[in-house]
């Protein structure tokens, strides 16, 4: 019985490790007082639509599933009548050891930037701030 309790305790710790938190941050760094429209979704959740003011940001945290298939898609819109837009994968995992951490997106005048925030040894493919997408007219 004692061995069973030890096994259950260790197994529980391993399971908590595999469902650790992750998140998305979307910041509005547009010029000329432009608002940023955003909507994100996964298989189970819909976030938004929300309007992010200049200099503002939207942050959400969530748990990744045990199968490591958690993925969020987002749409961002800006400009007159929100005619400039981009649809993209805002969060995904790259394997069993990847915990996801926070994917930090920044909407700027001509492009959208990403920085995957480093959260220790478990982050796979950490990146510095770099351009990922152009706006679609």
Swiss-Prot record:
Glycans are attached at residue 87. It holds the Pfam family Self-incomp_S1. Keywords: Glycoprotein, Secreted, Self-incompatibility, Signal. PANTHER family: PTHR31232, S-PROTEIN HOMOLOG-RELATED. This is S-protein homolog 16. Belongs to the plant self-incompatibility (S1) protein family. The keyword Secreted applies. GO terms for biological process: rejection of self pollen. It comes from the Eukaryota. Coiled coil: none annotated. It is found in: Secreted. The keyword Signal applies. InterPro entries: Self-incomp_S1 (IPR010264). GO terms for cellular component: extracellular region. Residues 1-21 form the signal peptide. Its main location: secreted.
């Amino acid at each position: 019985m004692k061995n069973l309790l030890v096994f259950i305790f260790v197994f529980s710790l391993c399971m908590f490790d595999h469902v650790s938190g992750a998140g998305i941050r979307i910041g509005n760094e547009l010029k000329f007082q432009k608002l940023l429209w955003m909507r994100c979704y996964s298989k189970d959740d819909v976030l938004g639509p929300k309007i992010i003011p200049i200099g503002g940001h939207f942050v959400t945290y969530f748990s990744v599933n045990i199968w490591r298939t958690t993925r969020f898609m987002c749409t961002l819109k800006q400009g007159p009548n929100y005619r400039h837009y981009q649809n993209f994968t805002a969060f995904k995992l790259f394997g069993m050891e990847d915990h996801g951490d926070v994917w930090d997106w920044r909407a700027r005048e001509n492009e959208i930037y990403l920085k995957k925030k480093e959260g220790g040894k478990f982050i796979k493919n950490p990146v510095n701030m770099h351009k990922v997408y152009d706006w679609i007219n």
